């Protein structure tokens, strides 16, 4: 049984001074203006996961040292405190900065499966779609156990699904069908292994309807390859208990954003989904209760889940079709309060 996050508390972490007993649902669409703290909320998931994976101090060192994680720095904040409740189990910690720019860690656990759930969290970021991006390169066929955060192993992962028995094949076919909705000319992935010395590698080759010519990853637009990665993450047969996706809307056509929303909804039956976005079109696809507004309040990040009392105002915004700044302002995202 998947262990989703029911509630979380985090204090003193970056722009998040005090977020207490905040509830997460199956779908959590976090929207806010630049600087509201969405990225810090996303990074919190990475940090907690690395604590459980025992790679925490290296994570802190490579991201600026302890002071970079404390709300307004060492002088303002003496520690970071957090607690996560997952299906009746819990994990909490206190982080106290040390003289060598690391943290002294005090942890508490209640439950046998909490470490497995947290260590499996994945924060997907498919921002780099450049010609040299990992997702466009060849990767060894053995790198297929799970989809990497930057989709560097998208080709071997898809190849493994296609050869993984009924469950994997079903997932693979669903991914292909989703891609065809966005790219009607798309036929299938080729994924033909090529030997490089002692290793076999595969890259994201594909075919177009009406021809067997093997198109290369560089033939895919930024939006197309990003959507392939998103569809794969959301339709994978054995997802982690919680997945976080940072700004999935980048480079996507409005029609693709609507299809993405359908994939998120379908995935939420099997995994908890947290999405950080600036896209009003993406937000507009979800129920009011799925939306979490991030804004600055008294110099810190505040998160607020919308409810039915907000629905009338949102419906008015939709009818008026405001631009994004107006839309954010009316939600309270652009105001320092």
Residue ranges of predicted features:
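Phosphate-coordinating catalytic segments in nucleotide- and nucleic-acid-processing enzymes
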Residues: 51-238, 323-336
């Amino acid at each position: 049984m998947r262990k989703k996050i029911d509630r979380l508390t985090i204090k003193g972490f970056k722009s998040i001074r005090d977020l207490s007993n905040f509830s997460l649902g199956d779908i959590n669409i976090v929207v806010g203006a630049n600087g509201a703290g969405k990225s810090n909320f996303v990074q919190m998931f990475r940090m907690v996961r690395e604590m459980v994976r025992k790679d925490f101090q290296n994570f802190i060192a490579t991201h600026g040292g302890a002071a970079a994680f404390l709300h307004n720095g060492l002088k303002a904040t003496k520690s970071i405190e957090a607690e996560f409740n997952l299906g009746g189990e819990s994990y909490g910690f206190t982080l106290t900065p040390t003289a060598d720019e690391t943290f002294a860690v005090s942890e508490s656990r209640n439950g046998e499966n909490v470490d497995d759930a947290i260590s499996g969290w994945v924060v997907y970021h498919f921002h780099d779609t450049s010609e040299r991006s990992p997702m466009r390169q060849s990767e060894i066929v053995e790198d297929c156990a799970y989809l990497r955060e930057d989709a560097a192993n998208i080709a071997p992962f898809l190849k493994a699904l296609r050869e993984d028995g009924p469950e994997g094949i079903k997932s693979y076919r669903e991914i292909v069908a989703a891609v065809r909705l966005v790219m009607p000319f798309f036929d299938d992935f080729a994924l033909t292994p090529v030997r490089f010395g002692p290793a076999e590698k595969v890259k994201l080759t594909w075919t177009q309807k009406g021809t067997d010519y093997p198109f290369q990853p560089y033939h895919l637009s930024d939006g197309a390859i990003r959507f392939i990665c998103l569809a794969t993450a959301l339709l994978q047969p054995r997802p982690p208990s919680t997945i976080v996706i940072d700004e999935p809307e980048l480079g996507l056509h409005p029609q693709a954003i609507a299809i993405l929303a359908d994939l998120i909804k379908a995935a939420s039956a099997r995994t908890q989904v947290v999405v950080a976005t600036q896209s009003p079109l993406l937000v507009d696809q979800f129920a009011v209760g799925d939306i979490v507004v991030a804004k600055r309040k008294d110099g810190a990040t505040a998160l607020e889940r919308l409810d039915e009392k907000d629905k009338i105002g949102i419906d008015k915004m939709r009818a008026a079709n405001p631009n994004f700044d107006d839309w954010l302002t009316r939600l309270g995202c652009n105001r320092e309060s």
